[in-house]
A protein has these predicted regions:
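Small-molecule kinase domains that catalyze NTP-dependent phosphoryl transfer to phosphate-bearing small molecules
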Residues: 130-176
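Post-Walker A helix-loop "phosphate-sensing" segment adjacent to the P-loop in P-loop NTPases
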Residues: 23-31
Length: 180
């Protein structure tokens, strides 16, 4: 089983790329994170596994997460895949989570999906409603994540054109499957 970690700043298009890959590749599935937060009205049915804090902590203490963190008082974690999993697994997580995954599974394919430039990232963030101040904060965070990802050996994919980026990510996955 191949484990693919996809990270990148908000607005880079990683979610869109991940969905396109999973929809077009029957050998690839998107990981479902566990969370202790409450279900929102707009949550997609299979996006998360909603659990109590006690359930989360029990799995955590048993070593049952590839990576996990806390955000705004709620826990989020990516479960260790089942041994019987016959499909490759795609994780859409931040670089800090990717660091945890690599500590356990150093052969994971780690991809950093990025906008072609900070100006383009700013444009995308503002267009989706983040506002100028929030966009600047996200760009500063993206620079930090970019540097961390590079230090961890992530492969960078610039999403200047969505279809081209999807083809590039698919080629990296195919090469990893072939053992290249």
């Amino acid at each position: 089983m191949l484990l693919v970690v996809m990270s990148g700043p908000g607005g880079a298009g990683k979610g869109t790329i991940a969905r396109a890959l999973v929809d077009s590749d029957p050998r690839l599935t998107l990981s479902r994170s566990w969370t202790t937060r409450d279900r929102r009205v707009d949550d997609v049915e299979d996006a998360y596994v909603f659990v109590t804090r006690a359930e989360f902590d029990a799995r955590l203490n048993a070593g049952g997460f590839l990576e996990w963190n806390e955000f705004l008082g709620q826990a989020y974690g990516t479960p260790v895949p089942e041994e019987s999993e016959d499909r490759d697994l795609l994780l859409e997580i931040d670089v800090a989570g990717g660091r945890q995954v690599l500590a356990r599974l150093p052969d994971a394919l780690c991809l950093f999906v990025d906008a072609p430039s900070d100006d383009e990232l700013r444009r995308r963030l503002i267009q989706r409603g983040d506002g100028r101040e929030r966009a600047e904060q996200r760009i500063a965070e993206a620079a930090r994540e970019r540097a961390e990802a590079e230090g961890l050996g992530y492969r960078r994919v610039a999403n200047d054109d969505l279809e081209t980026a999807i083809v590039a990510v698919r080629a990296l996955i195919d090469a990893a499957r072939a053992g290249a």
